[in-house]
């Protein structure tokens, strides 16, 4: 038997993938990498200019851009109405707030849970009600290693991502009868604009890197490749799973 150079179990040819939070970081990298593997991508975010930048780096044709604020029910409804049926959903949009417990505000809790937890739940609800996720489709929730590892000052963020992980498991049970899979990925620190937003000083970041056995943070495209595995037919028997991608930091 000869070697087949065209064989690729991670191919996304013929698949339509929705990626939220695609205007930067992991979302942008995922859209670009999915397009390289043949997917038609629907990218969404609040900033049209940054979405256009993502689109300019993608390859192939047939991609769609939807500007929507999915932290609101109105934004979720706009997104669900404007898109066609999909074969994959990457629920990536998220925010971070870092505060000690005694400084929590109700507004902070509502904001972070609305974006990180409630919005993904409402998008899935809307897509399923409209029957817009195709049979054998795949859902990937971008959670965080913070769902497992308790870092000082990170309680709100970690709780919102842990809730998303728990929801993923219930979602996986419910959609399995339709042949749809649901999984979550849990990155640790990834070198994106998200970590350079003044939440941490550069000195704190450099010190934190020493905790990683691989001595660096992850790259957005490395997270994207793990997402692609869970979107592709290579993971056809994988559902309800939480995949940790953290450069070994959880080993300590």
Model-derived segments and spans:
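Alpha-helical segment proximal to the catalytic Tyr-Lys
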Residues: 129, 173-177, 236
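Residue(s) in the substrate-gating loop at a strand-loop-helix junction
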Residues: 144
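Active-site helix of classical SDR
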Residues: 124, 160, 168
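Substrate-binding pocket helix/loop in short-chain dehydrogenase/reductase
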Residues: 100-101, 105-113, 208
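Short C-terminal tail/terminal secondary-structure segment
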Residues: 2-8, 149, 228, 239-252
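Short, small/polar-rich loop/turn modules that mediate ligand/substrate recognition or access, typified
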Residues: 90, 176, 181, 238-240
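Conserved glycine-rich cofactor-binding loop
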Residues: 23-24
